[in-house]
Regions:
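Solenoidal tandem-repeat scaffolds enriched in leucines and small polar residues
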Residues: 12-29, 36-37
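Short, low-complexity intrinsically disordered segments
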Residues: 13, 32, 42, 93-95, ...
């Protein structure tokens, strides 16, 4: 017997023939990331088919290698078999990521600047430190033979200035 998508699910993404839906539980500061049956996007087994992730999931971005999951505390990669922490800082709320269809990379506006996945790398640490904003809207824009990652921010947040 299967269940429908859990009520209260917010961030939703398709990856490798399944629907993923994040449901945040503020009392425990945990998110359940539910996944559907293969190609049964409306069928969920709520007893076994989920990942438990610390913090509030704010984004899920599909890549060939992994489903990249960004929370308010960390950035993770879920490969279908295992989940691992990519960064010990989170992402900015809003639409903080965009995909480059040419190289199939995902670009993410994080609490510490611009990151790329997969493989994961922070592209701005060591070069520039900016306030991350409190809300983000992002896109990869191709124009005039060039591509740019553009992010529009609601001002706020604190820049991370790493001590060396």
């Amino acid at each position: 017997d299967f269940d429908p998508i859990p009520t209260g699910s917010t961030v939703i993404q398709f990856w490798r023939g399944r629907l993923y839906a994040a449901q945040y539980f503020p009392g425990s500061d945990m998110t359940a990331v539910w996944h559907s049956q293969p190609l049964g996007f409306h069928l969920f087994d709520l007893t076994t088919d989920f990942l438990a992730i610390h913090g509030k999931v704010l984004m899920m971005a599909p890549t060939d290698e992994a489903l990249v999951i960004g929370t308010d505390k960390e950035i993770h990669a879920y490969t279908g078999d295992a989940i691992r922490v990519l960064a010990t800082y989170g992402v900015v709320p809003g639409w903080c990521w965009s995909r480059d269809d040419d190289d199939k990379s995902v670009y993410i506006w994080s609490q510490r600047g611009l990151c790329k996945a997969m493989p994961f790398a922070n592209l701005t640490s060591g070069h520039v430190s900016v306030a991350p904003g409190v809300q983000a809207g992002a896109a990869v824009v191709a124009q005039g033979g060039q591509k740019r990652f553009v992010v529009a921010l609601h001002a706020g947040g604190t820049a991370f200035n790493q001590r060396t």
